[in-house]
Swiss-Prot record:
Family statement: Belongs to the ATPase B chain family.
GO MF: proton-transporting ATP synthase activity, rotational mechanism
Its membrane topology: Single-pass membrane protein
Name recorded for this polypeptide: ATP synthase subunit b, chloroplastic
Coarse class of the protein's main subcellular location: plastid
Keyword Ion transport appears in the UniProt entry: yes
Localization (cell): Plastid, Chloroplast thylakoid membrane
Species for this entry: Cuscuta obtusiflora (Peruvian dodder)
UniProtKB keywords: ATP synthesis, CF(0), Chloroplast, Hydrogen ion transport, Ion transport, Membrane, Plastid, Thylakoid, Transmembrane, Transmembrane helix, Transport
Amino acid sequence: MNDVTYYLISLASQSPAGSFGLNTNNLVTTLINIGVVLCLLIIFGKGFLRNFLDTRKNKIVNTMQISDELYSSAVEKLEKAQARLCKVENEAKQLRVTGYSEIEHEKLNLINSTYKTLERLEKKKKETCSFEQQQAFNDVRQWVLQQTLQRVLKTLNGSFNPELHLRTIRINISMLGTLK
């Protein structure tokens, strides 16, 4: 780099006539100016550029480290979540199986209870029917007996006269006397 600088300086210091004068060649002058500016930038800007690039490199490295840590943490959390999911799924299956067996058990209990209740109600129904039937028979007997007694009384009242009445009383008294 120093060689280029010396070459450019030597070109600028030489004039075509051998003395100090104006260079009318704009292209050469522009190239010399660009070279001088670049040399100055390289010499004086090297530290700034190095610091800028080092800072940028450190930021990138830190960002990558943080990303790796976050990735590791996310993978760890994912593995824990998957393990927890498997555990919960197994528990859900177990609860489902247990629930189905409990439902079947409760269903059987309900069927048995309903069957027993139906038997009890059927027995009560039969008892009630029997009681009602017996009550109806008793009511009919009582009515028939009452009707019969009323007829007998009517018949007796109509056919009894005082003489027949006395004779019946005597016969009954004599029968009672023979029983003793």
